[in-house]
């Protein structure tokens, strides 16, 4: 269980679900009565896209209305997040996203078109999991220590990919750089799938990205996994060490995926979405599908508890970005 999962699980145990208590006795609104849109800020093939399609399918089954996933990739997830922030707060437009557009980009990018804290309403987390550090299969480095040595000897010649500025892969690599005192060139893509394709084609040296995005290429031999970013080895890759084991003590980095509504969305609608997601996350079908992607269920917190977590994450990343001098390059 990673830091995110522990935090959310503890919050869920310590507090009764606030949103439910707020609306006890209230009448559930006639919602939805038409198609609901779920926006994703990254292309198909990303881990967040898998989570979105799974959640959308289950919501559609429960609600009896179409729930469609729209991929609006670009700007590190900001395009989709901005569209949701500016959408009518009627419950028919939601965002399923990874952390970047919510807790990172505001501290990294100038002239953000939306305020993630004021303009977006946290509803619930869905899943979380570790990342994999992988390299193209012909890179001379066979382990993390050799990769660090190669990066120092290459003097800015190695490049790493991400799914966009401020994305989880971007921040994971920047943290790696900071903790190992190496320099590498950042190559941002619209999504991790494009970067993985370039690694397989030997045009990109390395990525630190989600297990759903990389496992196919790792298993197929197109890329080589050097480490996982969790504190414990992952059962899907038992022979791959953690970055702690590989010589970077204290390195831990995971990704979470969560749902957000526009600010000022009715508490009744927020509660309905929250309860629907909690129900689906308890089913064996959903748990099995998430486990098959090597991610964990992470949806125990109420909207208020999850909102508190988001604010803390935002403050922590602002400090990391400032301390490390990370730039939007």
Residue positions per predicted region:
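Short, low-complexity disordered leader/linker segments with a strong preference
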Residues: 1-33, 145, 329
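N-terminal (or domain-start) structured segment
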Residues: 25-118, 157-159, 181-208, 300, ...
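Short beta-strand/turn micro-motifs at beta-sheet edges
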Residues: 26-28, 119-123, 244-250
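An extracytoplasmic/periplasmic, membrane-proximal ligand-sensing/linker region
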Residues: 33-35, 180-182, 245, 267-329
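Hinge/capping helix and adjacent helix->loop/strand transition within the periplasmic-binding protein
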Residues: 86-92, 99, 107-194, 243, ...
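A ligand-binding cleft/hinge motif common to bilobed small-molecule-binding domains
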Residues: 101-111, 170, 175-179, 206-240
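C-terminal lobe and pocket-closing loops
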Residues: 214-283, 312-315, 320
């Amino acid at each position: 269980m990673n830091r995110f999962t522990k935090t959310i699980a503890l919050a869920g145990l310590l507090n009764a679900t606030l949103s439910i208590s707020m609306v006890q006795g209230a009448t559930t609104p006639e919602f939805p009565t038409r198609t609901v849109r779920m926006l994703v800020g990254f292309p198909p093939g990303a881990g967040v896209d898998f989570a979105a399609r799974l959640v959308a399918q289950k919501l559609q089954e429960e609600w009896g209305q179409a729930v469609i996933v729209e991929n609006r990739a670009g700007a590190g997830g900001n395009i989709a997040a901005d569209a949701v922030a500016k959408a009518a707060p009627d419950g028919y437009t939601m965002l399923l996203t990874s952390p970047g557009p919510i807790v990172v980009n505001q501290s990294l990018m100038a002239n953000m078109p939306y305020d993630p804290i004021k303009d977006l309403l946290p509803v619930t987390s869905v899943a979380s999991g570790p990342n994999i550090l992988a390299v193209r299969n012909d890179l001379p480095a066979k382990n993390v220590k050799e990769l660090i040595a190669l990066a120092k000897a290459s003097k800015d010649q190695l490049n790493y990919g991400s799914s966009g500025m401020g994305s989880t892969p971007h921040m994971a690599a920047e943290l790696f750089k900071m903790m190992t005192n190496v320099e590498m060139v950042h190559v941002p893509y619209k999504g991790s799938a494009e970067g993985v394709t370039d690694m397989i084609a030997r045009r990109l040296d390395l990525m630190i990205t989600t297990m759903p995005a990389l496992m196919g290429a790792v298993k197929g031999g197109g890329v080589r996994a050097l480490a996982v970013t969790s504190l414990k080895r992952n059962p899907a890759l038992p022979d791959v060490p953690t970055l702690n084991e590989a010589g970077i003590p204290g390195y831990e980095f995971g990704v979470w995926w969560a749902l957000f509504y526009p600010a000022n969305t009715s508490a009744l609608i927020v509660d309905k979405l929250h309860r629907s997601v909690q129900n689906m996350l308890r089913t064996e079908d959903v748990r099995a599908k998430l486990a098959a992607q090597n991610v964990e269920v992470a949806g125990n917190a109420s909207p208020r508890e999850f909102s508190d977590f988001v604010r803390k994450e935002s403050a922590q990343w602002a400090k990391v970005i400032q301390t490390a001098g990370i730039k939007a390059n």
